[in-house]
Regions:
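Feature of Fe-S/electron-transfer and energy-metabolism proteins
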Residues: 1-546
């Protein structure tokens, strides 16, 4: 059924897609009317249940949020900072309680106190002078430093930047793919999958229509590196997508940008317009015979769309449920066509690889983790911000030298988002910023976002927060995740609020079921931080179990 829906959705192509039409139908009243959804179902020759199922999933289109006027961030960094209750109290002076909703991570983890109003994000001291009639968000201000400058290198202007593209287009796709292979770059979105393998698989598919998708739905609380690249280095991302298109034979690049990053949408669109003005988009670019264009899809608020197949379903206007694999997207992706899905930071790294060569890139980092990595530090650090470091850099250097240590006592850090490991402070000296170091020690590097858990923050409260997040954001397709995350939240909530003792054997069975039975890394990944907490903070947690 899903395959048929993909075909039906693809009949009108990217420029007239169902997902955007559902979003447009929600603008006036906060949610699409029944009549609008039925009309779209008829237009795209799909069932009415399909359009309703899609609209009822997203934060910005679902019925229960239609009266929301302002959204408070409930991401992990903001929760740990302990400022959101004060922000909510101040917002209640301007809005009724039923007009205040929540969103998970606005990318303001470096100063917290974040909220979203009327298409803009606010944080820090913004709440102190917030006025509905004339809101003025301050310009984001955080540290951006590099020990090895690649991703954070200054932008040299359109002409200089894209002279490299013109040179690259004179080479064969095999030559360029070989440079990607030699670089040994692995995906920066969390999984660490070899990028060249994905590109080659798509290249080898025989199909006249292919797509490159930039997964800019960075939803991991604590991570704002993709936001930085989209707002400050958009042409690095666009360049990477164009090279991917040339190598694989794709003519469309789709940027799926999360709704929680509204400013980024406008900045990336401006960058695309600059390319068009300079005749670097469309047919036969620079006389090379290469055709390529971009389409921005603005997401509507769903963390699960960071999973590549849920993202593809979302673009098609389907409910963003995870697909079973195989077939993989490189064979059957968007509209059932061969598709490459890469993370923002992964695509941005392509510029350096093409400019300096794959061998030069591979000299950076460790044996299996090459290149550089952006690391995000939250507001508990004396120097919060984004730091570009070479893979293999000691975590202690990131924390103590670059980050300047902690402002207040911290007992652990969650690194790599809500599905990343919980690293106790005493383990910092044993880790380095690379995939293998974290995996060998029972953690996950993921996006390399670092959220601090203060000493006075209950670890059981933290586990409740993780389960609440996982349950709310589950796509609901597989039973282990849909039911297991909900059950985990119920157990931890009761333990925190009702003097309830959790059966440890039952809890362990729940974690094993989630890990082994879930269809994707959402349900399968949430047991990792829970198990880390049980291992390293047993003394604090043991009284909650029998």
């Amino acid at each position: 059924m899903s395959k048929n829906l993909s075909e039906l959705s693809g009949r009108k192509g990217l420029t007239n897609n169902l997902f955007e039409k559902i979003g447009e139908a929600a603008k006036e009243n906060g949610t699409p009317t029944t009549e609008a959804l039925e009309k779209l179902a008829n237009e795209f020759i799909i069932g009415k249940a399909n359009t309703y199922g899609t609209a009822s999933f997203y934060d910005f289109t679902k019925e229960e949020n239609k009266d929301k006027k302002i959204y408070l961030c409930n991401g992990t960094a903001c929760v740990c900072a302990g400022k959101q209750d004060d922000v909510k109290n101040k917002l209640e002076k301007h809005f009724n309680i039923n007009e205040i909703g929540h969103m998970t991570c606005l990318g303001r983890c470096y100063e917290n106190a974040a909220f979203h109003y009327n298409g803009k994000n606010y944080s820090g001291n913004d709440i102190s002078h917030f006025q509905i009639s004339n809101p003025k968000p301050q310009i984001p201000n955080y540290n951006i430093k590099s020990t090895t400058e690649l991703l954070t290198a200054p932008f040299g202007g359109i002409e200089k930047h894209y002279s490299l593209l013109k040179t690259a287009l004179k080479k064969s796709s095999d030559e360029l793919l070989n440079e990607i292979k030699k670089s040994n770059i692995r995906g920066r979105g969390g999984a660490g999958f070899p990028m060249a393998f994905k590109w080659e698989a798509c290249k080898n598919e025989k199909n006249d229509t292919k797509f490159i998708i930039c997964n800019a739905d960075e939803g991991d609380p604590g991570a704002y590196s993709d936001l930085y690249l989209l707002e400050n280095r958009p042409h690095s991302v666009l360049f990477g997508m164009m090279i991917a298109g040339f190598i694989t034979g794709a003519e469309w690049g789709v940027l799926y940008i999360r709704a929680e990053y509204p400013e980024a949408v406008g900045i990336v669109q401006k960058a695309i317009d600059e390319l068009r003005t300079n005749n670097l988009l469309g047919n036969n670019i620079d006389g090379s015979g290469f055709n390529f264009d971009f389409k921005i899809i603005k997401a509507q608020g769903a963390y699960i769309c960071g999973e590549e197949t849920a993202l593809i379903n979302s673009i098609e206007g389907q409910r963003p449920e995870v697909r079973t694999r195989p077939p993989f997207p490189t064979k059957q992706g968007l509209f059932n066509k061969p598709t490459v899905v890469n993370n923002v930071e992964t695509l941005a790294a392509v510029y350096s690889i093409i400019k300096k060569g794959g061998d030069a890139y591979a000299k950076l980092g460790t044996e299996k983790s090459k290149g550089t990595k952006l690391v995000c530090l939250d507001s508990f650090f004396n120097n919060p911000g984004i730091y570009e470091v070479e893979m293999g850099t000691p975590l202690s250097k990131v924390v103590n030298e670059l980050g300047g240590g902690f402002k207040s006592p911290v007992k652990a850090m969650q690194i790599g988002g809500p599905l990343g490991g919980i690293v106790p402070i005493e383990k910092i000296k044993e880790l380095s910023i690379d995939f293998e170091s974290f995996a060998q020690n029972g953690f996950l590097l993921g996006h390399a976002s670092i959220v601090c858990i203060p000493t006075n923050f209950s670890m059981m409260k933290y586990l409740e927060h993780l389960f609440e997040f996982a349950a709310y954001e589950s796509c609901g397709k597989c039973f282990p995740c849909r039911l297991g995350t909900k059950r985990g939240h119920e157990l931890t909530s009761k333990a925190n609020n009702q003097n309830y003792k959790i059966d440890r054997n039952l809890f362990n069975d729940l974690l094993d079921t989630l890990q082994q039975g879930s269809l994707c890394a959402h349900g399968g990944g949430i047991p990792l931080p829970i198990k880390n907490a049980l291992q390293y903070f047993n003394d604090e947690l043991k009284n909650y179990f029998n």
